[in-house]
Amino acid sequence: MMRQAAKMFLTFLMLTILGACSGDDSTTINIEAPSNNGGGSDGGSGGGDSGGGDTGGETPATCPEGTTEVSEGLCELPATISSDMTLKSGVSYLMTGRVTVGNGNGQLETNGDGTLDDGSAVQAATLTIEAGVEVFGETGTFANLLITRGSKIMAMGTADAPIVFSSDDAGYDGSGEWGGLIIHGYAPHNECAVGGSYCDIDSEGESGFAGGYDADDSSGVLRYVVVAEGGYEFSTGNEI
């Protein structure tokens, strides 16, 4: 369903490494699957285990401002991120539904001034994810991370400490267990009107609008990032 240049759907990719590897890079990346990743689906209201991240016996970091502590070492992301946020290492993160960064998936004003049709400005929020962070989507839900137009994801892992998105159950061998990662942008789309003042392409996965006329638009960086076990179908031809 990859027909939109204005966005990337990075889902249903079983342990695929995105970016940061040159053609002759022979670096090996090993990821040990915990016995219970996030603990969100097995521990009732208590959230199960203390999160999928291995803190090596050290006291885990506290949950960043704007997140909610589910259990020790596990922080739930909010439904909306409208300003810059950093997901620090030392704890893991849980998504129980859609997490939307920015508001650029709304319809744009038809006069082409770059504002939304309700008169509000497009937010420019940046979600930074530190190396080694694990982000879990609640198993059996459409939990997903949506980066909207005007906002960015800066996910810069390393070979020794990749950033991993997966469901919150044990292991990494499933598929279609949660939604995935959706990235919108202002890049040109083949359905945008030639010479138009604005472009709104209704995107799949019920993720709102994307598209524009900026061929140099950037929605951030993905380096040593793994997206595993994702994929959610809303209806035929409409999926993450």
Stretches with model-predicted labels:
Residues 17-20:
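C-terminal motif of bacterial Sec signal peptides marking the signal peptidase cleavage site
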Residues 22-240:
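Beta-strand/loop edge motif enriched in small/polar residues
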Residues 11-15:
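Sec-dependent N-terminal signal peptides of Gram-positive bacterial secreted proteins and lipoproteins
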Residues 1-10:
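Bacterial N-terminal signal peptides that target proteins for export
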